[in-house]
């Protein structure tokens, strides 16, 4: 099989060699990470040490941003716990040393969140434009992150523009939304030229969605053979994703709900669902990683406790709640694997 590492690597090599479309054997994924990787190849050659070094630096910087976020929303103790938990989380460290976009998306998630809470403190023209461009990169990295957009709009309206007059609001929305949407154009054009049709950044959405939304789905992992067997057994080949879901809900609503429950269960527990690689192979063959934090359930449990304890200050943590719910849904609505959970 052709793994995602190879596709990102080949697309990056082609971009560094002059192919502005960064084509690869499989072009179904959002091309942003290929351009990030290709820029490194262009500057340093196909140097994996440069790639991993930059991704490790982004991880370290993300830890600092998490400290600042925790301190800003709660206090320095919470900030330090967030810093320590993220910087010593073995799964994140593993993905920082791999040519996959998991750590890249995680960094953009953290930076975009930090930019938004800073925007509330200093909503200058430069901050509005900068925040919009950071959000644009976050959304383009994986389109299911667009689930956050309605809540971002609500946050800006309710908390950033709260005391602004009508004319100021109009100007503010222009400074925020125009750069946000205009910055989508280059990648949308790239996707159109590569696929010969309009593609909203990522054409893998339908298969990623159906592969995790059939009644026999175990709740974790990605296996198209299981999906094909189910479709053939129930004569559901060739259906659109919505029709595929509708027929299952109508024929076995209880079974469909049980499948959703399994996905939620496996999302919050310790099992690291394999996708392109197994986290457990790295843990077994490393002398350091097993001594770091390697239990996702620890983070999910602390996160759920934090939600309950901070509910009285929900205005202060509105954006945190919104990001948390949207990032959980961005995984659970599709399929649950290790690398999708990190952000």
Predicted segments with their positions:
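Transmembrane-helix motifs of polytopic, lipid-linked glycan transferases
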Residues: 53-74, 110-111, 115, 301-308
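Lumenal/periplasmic acceptor-binding loop at the mouth of the active site in multi-pass
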Residues: 17-20, 223-307
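Membrane-interface transmembrane helices that cradle and orient dolichyl/undecaprenyl
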Residues: 76, 112-130, 138, 156-164, ...
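Transmembrane-helix signature of polytopic, membrane-embedded enzymes
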Residues: 61-88, 106-107, 121-128, 314-322
């Amino acid at each position: 099989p052709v793994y995602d590492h190879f596709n990102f690597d080949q697309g990056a090599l082609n971009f560094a060699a002059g192919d502005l479309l960064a084509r690869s054997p499989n072009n179904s994924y959002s091309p942003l990470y290929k351009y990030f990787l290709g820029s490194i190849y262009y500057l340093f050659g196909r140097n994996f040490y440069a790639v991993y070094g930059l991704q490790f630096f982004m991880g370290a910087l993300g830890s600092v941003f998490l400290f600042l976020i925790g301190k800003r929303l709660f206090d320095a103790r919470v900030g330090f716990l967030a810093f320590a938990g993220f910087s010593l989380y073995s799964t994140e460290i593993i993905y920082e040393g791999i040519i996959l976009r998991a750590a890249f998306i995680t960094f953009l998630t953290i930076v975009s969140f930090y930019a938004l809470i800073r925007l509330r403190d200093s909503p200058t023209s430069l901050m509005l434009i900068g925040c919009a461009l950071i959000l644009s990169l976050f959304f383009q990295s994986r389109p299911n992150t667009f689930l956050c957009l309605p809540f971002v709009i609500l946050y800006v309206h309710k908390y950033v523009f709260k005391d602004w007059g009508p004319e100021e609001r109009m100007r503010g929305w222009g400074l925020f939304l125009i750069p946000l949407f205009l910055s989508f154009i280059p990648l949308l054009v790239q996707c159109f030229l590569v696929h010969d049709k309009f593609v909203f950044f990522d054409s893998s959405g339908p298969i990623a969605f159906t592969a995790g939304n059939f009644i026999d789905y175990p709740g974790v992992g990605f296996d198209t053979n299981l999906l094909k067997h189910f479709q053939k057994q129930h004569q559901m080949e060739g259906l659109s994703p919505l029709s595929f879901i509708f027929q299952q809900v109508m024929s076995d609503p209880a079974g469909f709900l049980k499948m959703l429950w399994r996905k939620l269960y496996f999302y919050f527990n310790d099992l690291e669902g394999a996708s392109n690689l197994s986290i457990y192979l790295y843990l077994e063959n490393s002398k350091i990683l097993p001594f770091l934090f390697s239990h996702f359930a620890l983070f999910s449990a602390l996160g759920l406790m934090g939600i309950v304890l901070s509910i009285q200050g929900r205005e202060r943590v509105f954006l945190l709640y919104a990001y948390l719910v949207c990032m959980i849904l961005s995984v659970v609505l599709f399929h649950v694997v290790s690398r999708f959970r990190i952000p």
